[in-house]
Every structure is written in structure tokens, then in C-alpha cells.
Amino acid sequence: MTIRRLSFIPIFALVAVLAALTSGSAHAAPNTPDPATGFLLNGRQLTPQGAQVRLGNFPTGGAVTADGRFLWTVSAGLGANDIRIVDTVRRRVIQTIPIPGASGGVALDSRHRLAYVSGITVSRWWPTQATLPGAAGNCILVYGWKAASGKARFLRVIPVPPQPGSLPVQAFPATTATNAWPQKLAVSPDGSRLLVPLNLADSAAVVDINEHDRVRYVRLASGAYPFGAAILPGGRTGLVSNEATGTVSVVALRTGVKRRDITVGPPLSHPQDIVVDRAGRRAYVALSALDEVVVIDLHHWRVERTISVGRSAGLGTMPVALAISPEGARLFVAESGADELAVLHLPSPMTRAGLTWTLVGRIPTTEDPHAVVTVAAQGGRAAQLMYVAARGVGVGPNPTGPVTTDPFDPIWWAFNPIAPTTDVFGPGSGVTYLAAMVRGQAGLMALPSDAQVKRLSPAATRQIHPLGAQKAPAGTPLRAGGPIKHVFFVVRENRDYDQVLGDIGRGNSDPHLTIFGQDVTPNLHALVTRFPLLDHVFANSEASIQGHFWTSAASVPDYVDRNWVQEYAARGRPNDFGVYAVTFPGNGFLFDQAERQHISYFNYGEIAGDQPTLGDRDRSPALLAEEQRVAANSDLGPGLTPGGTYPAVGGIGQVTGSDPANPLDGEIFDSSLPAGAPPGSYSRIDSFRARFESQLAANAVPAFNYLCMTGDHTRGTQTGFPIPTAMVADNDLALGQLVDLISRSKIWSSSAIFVVEDDSQDGADHVNAHRIPVAVISPYARKGAIIHRRYDLVSVVRSMELIMGMKALSLNDALATPMYEAFTSRPLNAAPVGAIPAKIDLLTRNTAAAPWAALSNRLPLGEVDAVPQGQLDAILWKSVHGANSTPPPAGPNAEKGQ
């Protein structure tokens, strides 16, 4: 076979990138994420290979026609879901087909020119798509395409509902609802059968295409979460990977009977994509939670070997998709966590002796690759390699995306009992939201030779390392056994930098975008004046589900990353994130690592990985015991912790389980209880103070203290609740009281307090919509410094890990940029910190006359992130600046909702 020389078509100038990487200057590295240059929030500088084609919102599916002419991609994000067909010769999208909802499953039968796409329920945010075929969800959408043009037309819908007797989906709170959720797909070589894993129904569907789409169900293990599918060359046997049970089920397609389960990894190892070689001798399975590829011997139905495709720095390359080269000599592995393709030697006459099963090298891609395909050379065209990356190069500027201010705009229908009549996030809505503007990309290239892959490997390795890395300065307190013995990690909700600190008058700030400035947040302003002002810290998240994984685990598992967007989009995905084992990261959470290393800790309010009282089909006795140990060192408040007094992060402004007839019963304050508060009220800080003083008396203050403080999320202008500025001011007072309490204690000299936001989805920012206000408070924190270096949430986590001597949980925190620049080697900032009293009345309540009070009263503002952020942005702006004021534009790099 002739392989042409690889065409290098990166979308960024590699020379400039290498110059930045090799420069010794601390200022050579950029400090602002910029899609125009491929510089990401986490500090990675993308240098992707291949001609790049812009795709839709978060594409996770890809399949190519047998002739290699047309690449089908499936957009499966929070925004508009669609099919985009790429002409791989002209390297452009030739057709976009709107669909109600997608999970990313797509399979092509090139013999009959039929395409099959997994369909899920239409989003209520997109009412114009409710009339599209398959709007009820749980179906397969069938299309035909023309050989010459590649253009497709819709043919029919194949329903695949959950089979009778299916168990309810696992959700928090619990539900009786069932769902199927067709996931990846496989079509038999002759096109007669389709194999459909049903991710939420513990089963697979076998569709007999030639028998009027007759559907038979194959029952799999309870709590299996079936995901990937493959069919052997003879067309009689299918394989289904099961994410939670760590197995591959072997299915007889003629009878619809499961023959056996092959264990390919431990429970919760998340087997995902499966591919079978042309001879039907071996199958390959990607284990996304373990950074491994498993080889199955299909003659003996057993695991032949397991191959690591991870990085030595830590877990988290996340292999999610596979493709075998046309000649069968190599396996291409899409690694969504490392933005690369790993390439492995397979047994083949073309493979040199001794190289079988070894790593050839790695190919850098754009961000978050979720699909990879290969095509044989034909018609004078070289063999091809193609990939689909869900996040592309990040999100670009949005200078014309102001927050909608018209109360009669369709956005205001979003949480009305009457469904919206126009698309909330559609063209012309004027609404922007983080995640809905994420755009994927396809990378197209000639199939590289081994030598070319090896030459690309150094670029892939450079790409995963953040720019501007620093060596630990001499005497830094960010070290195990150093002077800092107690870490306090405060996680707040959703504010961006300019919304709070735009009026600080220092650093890179814009007062025109400020809502909760000096008068509302005097404590934070004072803290970032005395301690470092960090004006380039970015949230890695778009919303709270991701945000609390980043803060508590330094990573977001692929299961969470691909599913939270559809839960937020109201397409029927249950909320199981962080509370059911199937959603947990491979190495667990910070609390789990503290347990493993015997590092003392206490958790105030974080529910991620801390719900042992819930029934869970996938929780082993060992995992249950681990959760119980964490729960014993946690306070999640009434209803979740026996005798608990510190409310969990799940609700805003109310105690879980308060009296529905009295919406103010059990109202929660972040700060000390204000005088005149309603009966039964209490505060997070009062709860913390009682436990902290007890720990001090016993000389038992933990090394790691994690505190959720959520009152700054606000309740909008809902009648009877504190006005937004009062809730944010109360949260600010809580922060001031926390620092005051710690700084006047006997452990202050050995303490550090890190304050972050879980995400940045609220407000406008002139630098980047992901920028957040962060405070670092310690006797060792630099006095009055202004620090422009780029950091992210994982930088904060890594800094805390270094202090505690905690091992990194993932590739993300292992490679993150520690906040060395924020600290000094000596305690030069050791004076106690006094809390500044609130400058506004914390008991001021919204009245029916408040701006858009009627609208706020219809919204579920007591639930985290249950309201489109653009909507809440406008409410908050008008609550401060008046009903006739106009909120500012979203600013550069905003995503939908900002």
C-alpha cells in the first residue's frame, strides 16, 4: 500500500507556539484564553493536525462513508442538535439537518446508503424542533443519501422505547420515570440488523431492518449503562460495552439472546467504544476511566491483554473512541482528556517483530476528540484519518451578544407553565449561554506513516502541558511539610470577575460591568487589596455540575461531560451527577484521596461523592464503605447528615425539606444570623464556627477544610426573599467572618484560605466569560500584589494538594500551574483580618414591585442552575440599576447564557 506524505495543516502557527514554549520569560506565555490562537482555559496551546472544519454544538458522533467522501457528525450539546455532513474532499459542511435531540450515536450502511442516528427527546428550549421527526425521543432516525452529492433525506423513525419492566432511572431526587436513551450504534455488514445499546434501560435493542424494523430486546445486567456497540463480520454476533459493570456483553443477533459477559475491567471502568478487526479475530475496547484499551480474543471469548494509553503524569487521557487502520496494522485511540490520538501497533504482517502492542506515538488534535475514523486508499486518493473534537478550539468572542432585556422576549417563557413558542437559544433570540456556543471541529488528514506519527508525538506532549510552567521557588510554602498546615477551600456560586471586582480600580477590571461592587462586597474587595489580586483566573466549567467536579475532583468524567448538557437542556437525561457511582471520576474525589493518604479533612456542604444513604445499583460494598467514611467527616445539613447543621450545596436559600406551604421556613444565611431574621433561620458560618471552635479546643483542626457557600447564587427578585444585593452581601459578610475567625485563631500562622467560584456563568466580563474572582488569604500570601499570570480552578486544587502532600487525582491537577506567584517564603502578611459589616440591609426583601418580580416568582431559583443564566443576569442587573436600565453586552469569549 502506498501512503502519501502527511500534509501538515495545523490551524495555528507552530513556530510561534514553539517560541512561547521554549522562552524562559514568565511573560512570554499568554494569560488570556483565546480561540483565535487555540490557547485554552487550562493553559494548553493547541497545535492540531489536519485540515479543520467547523462543526455544530458539542459533536460527539462521527461516521464516514465507505468511499471516504462524506463524514457524518452529530451535534449533541445543550444547544441545537443536528447532523452535519462534511465533504471530506472539499473540506466543508455541505448539509446541516436539524434533529430534536441526539446522544451522539451514528452508524452508516454504505452498501444501501442508509444512515442511522440515535434520537432523544426534544428540548423545551427549542419548540420549533418539536415538529421534527423523532421529537418524542427513544428512537433511531433513518436517512438515505445520494452517492454523488452526499446530500441526505429523512426516511423514517424506528422507536426503541424502554422495554416493559425496565427499572426507573437513577436520579436525584428519585423518580419513577423510565427512559431508554439509545447510545452508540452498529449496523451489520449486510445492513440487515442494527444493534442499539440503551444506556438508561439496562438493555440493548436488536432491530431487524428487513423485517419491517422489528425490535427485540436483550436484557443486560442491572445498572449496566450499555454504551458502545460492534457487530462481528459474519453479522450474527454483536458486542455491547457496559459502562458501570466493566463488561462487554456478547449478543446473538438472530435470537436476541445474551450469550455471555466478558469482564474487561473493574466496575465503573467505563468501557466505551468497541471496534472489531476485519477477520473477526479480535475486538478492542476503550476504558475511559482507566486510560486503557482492552484486547478481546473473539475465538475464546476472553481478554487477551490490556494496554495502557495513559500518560505517566496521571490518570485522565480518557480513551473514548477507536478506529483500526485500513491495513489492520494500527489502532487509533481518541483521548478526550488529552486532546490527542494515541496510535498502537497491532498484530499484522506489516508490523515489525517486537513492536506488536506497543505505542507508535500520538497525534495532537483540537479539544476533546470524541470520534475517530479511517478510510482506505481508493480512486487515486490516499488513505485518510479523520477525527471529531467536541470543543474544537474553545469559544470565540461574542461582541454582539447582549443579554436580553425585553420581558416579553421568548426567553421569559422558559420556566413558564406554558412552554416557549420560539427557540430560546435560537438565531435572533439575543440570548447567550455558556456551553450552547461551544463548537466542535473535524480534523481531516492523509493517514500518517509510523515515522510521521513519531514526529508528531513531541507536539502532542507539549500540547498537554500548560504554557508558562514554573519551577517551585526556593522556600515556597506550597510544599508538604512546609509552614502551612491547614487549608480552607471556599467554593461559591457563579459570579464572574467584572461583575464583582470590575470596580476594584486595579488590575484588568471594567467598572461598567459591575453589579456587586465595593458597596455590596466590601470584604472581598478588602481581601484582594491586602492580599493578591489575581485578575486572570479562569473557571474550567460552564455550569455548576461541571464546576463542582472541577473543585472536588480536578476532572470531569466523560460520562458527566457528555450527559450534563442534555440534562440542562431538558432532553430527559436524569440528574445523577456526583451522587451516583456511575458518575464518579476514576480516582474519586479529594476526600477519597485524603482518606487514602490519611490526611485529615472535613467537608461542609459538598454533596459530590458523599451520598451513602442513596440506593445505588452500581455501588460496591467497598465503595459504600468509602462513602460512609467520607460522610462521617461531612456535614450536609438536615435530611442528608444526621444532626447536620451545615446546608448542602444542592439548594439556594432554603433548607432541604422545608415546609412547601411556607417558602421562608428554614431560610439559610451564609453569614451570621442577621437580627430580625425569620424564626428557624440559621447560618452556615454559625455552623462552621461551632465545629471550628470545638476542633481548636481539641487541637484537631483538619488539614483540609472544604466549604460550600452558595447564597451568592441569589433568588432573583422572587417576592419575599432577600434582594439579590442582600444575598450577595450576606455571602460576602460570611467570607469576612470566616477569615476573621481563622485569622484570630491560634492556627492562623499555619493556614491558607482559597476562595473560588464554581463557574463563571453569571454576568459579563470584558476579558473572558470564564474569568472568576479568586482570593488567596494567608500570612504567606503576597501583600498587595497584582498577579496577571493565568491560573484556573485546577491551579487552585494543585496548590492545595502541594501544601497537604496530596497526590494528584488526575492528569489535570498533576500538570496544572501552581499558584507560586501568589505566595512568599516568609509570613509577611500575618496581621489578623477584621470582618467588614455589610453596608446594606441584609433583611431587605423583594416586593411585588421589584423589577420582574412576577417573572422571578415563576422561576425555580431555589435550585442550582435551573434558570438560563442570561435571564438571571438581566434580573440581577435591573434589581441593582433599575427596571429601565439595560444590561451590558456579554463581552468577549462569552458562551450562550453569559
What does each model-identified segment do?
Residues 438, 452-898:
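N-terminal pro-sequences and low-complexity stem/linker regions of secreted or lumenal proteins
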